[in-house]
Design a protein with these regions (language model features):
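Repetitive helical segments and hydrophobic/amphipathic motifs
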Residues: 11-12
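Surface-exposed, polar/charged interaction patches used for macromolecular assembly or partner binding
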Residues: 2-7, 16-347
């Protein structure tokens, strides 16, 4: 009898794992896929998985290739089974190269590829401004920083090659500064805690010389017209980090959308949004959250009074840059118009 029960339990366990595998993999998924230029990891993950944020759970590193965590155009993504469990791995395209004595040999083409050629998790053109230009700073940081006085002969500063003057306390260890303009001040919609200040990236400068508290600057790059009063902060020593992977948060997250790029109130697919949770709460770059449309308040014409309708799941977003108390995220799916104060939770 004991053996029979063990056999039934084993069969049930196998059946459960088989069901779990079926639930993980998308119906009609391919067995392999050749990566094309313009693909994103989110697209590829969604080709194989019902829940693209489960990519880390099914990804299998191929130790036989260089940069095994990166995926390049031309790579072959394959669905394989290891110990009966589905795994996704990558095979790198091989090419023929001349060898000694007129022979040829196979060589991984990645040896001539640069890591910046790797596909990104989400479309870079949608988030580049928020990755490399703008940022969130603590209250008072901009007010305490140096500021633009004027251009040469008090002319408007137009762009690269112009000269400008700034006033304030400059740190001699920094020769490159970024120009910022103070933007929206963010507060938590529930607790009213001050979350940070949006610093809009305007351009970059190099310090030519410093006389007391006056600095002579050479404008290196501008994204908008530089104005008197714009602030200067040391340029961030960071590259555009597009190499991250879709994942579910490690902790329970209850967030809200507090702002949308461009200051609009409605949110749609590929909009950048700011949410009121960050590194302090355990959010990481690549984390995916489900967006819930806040339920309407309606009148109960039978019993009287007002009733809040349930929140409805209406989309997905991915966090691509985190700060202490808030994060930037890209809306990847939206099946209806979303808005500020809509909620974001674990998927």
């Amino acid at each position: 009898m004991k053996k029979i029960l063990l056999a039934v339990a084993a069969a049930s366990l196998i059946s459960f794992f088989s069901w779990a595998d079926d639930a993980l993999l998308k119906t009609g998924h391919p067995d392999e896929y050749t990566v094309k230029k313009g693909d994103t990891l989110w697209d590829i993950s969604g080709t194989f998985l019902n829940s693209p944020w489960l990519w880390p759970e099914i990804w299998h590193v191929n130790p036989q290739i260089e940069n095994p965590h990166l995926i390049f155009p031309g790579d072959l993504i394959k669905l394989i089974y290891l110990d009966g469990q589905p795994r996704i791995t990558v095979e790198r395209t091989l090419k023929m190269v001349p060898g000694a004595g007129g022979t040829t040999k196979l060589s991984p083409s990645i040896r001539v590829q640069q890591t910046e050629d790797a596909i990104s998790a989400i479309p870079l053109d949608k988030i580049e401004v928020f990755l490399s230009r703008s940022r969130i700073v603590e209250p008072g940081v901009l007010e305490a920083s140096p500021y633009i006085l004027a251009g040469q002969q008090q002319h408007v500063i137009v762009g690269a090659g112009d000269r400008a003057y700034a006033r304030g306390k400059f740190d001699s260890q920094y020769s490159n500064y970024s120009i910022y303009r103070k933007g929206q001040v963010f507060k938590d919609p529930v607790t009213k805690e001050l979350l940070g200040v949006y610093a809009q990236g305007i351009g970059t400068v190099s310090v030519a010389k410093i006389d007391d508290d006056i600095a002579t600057l050479d404008i290196v790059r501008t994204y908008e017209e530089v104005r008197s009063g714009d602030n200067l902060l040391p340029s961030e020593d960071r590259s555009v980090d597009s190499i991250f992977f879709p994942s579910a948060p490690d902790v329970d997250i209850e967030a809200q959308i507090v702002a949308v790029e461009g200051g609009v109130s409605q949110v749609g697919k590929f909009n950048v949004v700011m949410i009121n949770r960050g590194e302090r709460e355990g959010l990481q770059v690549g984390n995916v959250l489900a967006i819930y449309k806040t339920g309407e308040i309606v009148a109960d014409r039978v019993r009287g009074g007002k009733v809040a309708l349930p929140d409805e799941r209406s989309g997905l977003l991915m966090v691509f840059r985190t700060f202490e108390k808030m994060s930037f995220a890209l809306v990847l799916e939206a099946d209806r118009a979303l808005a500020i104060n809509d909620k974001a939770r674990n998927p």
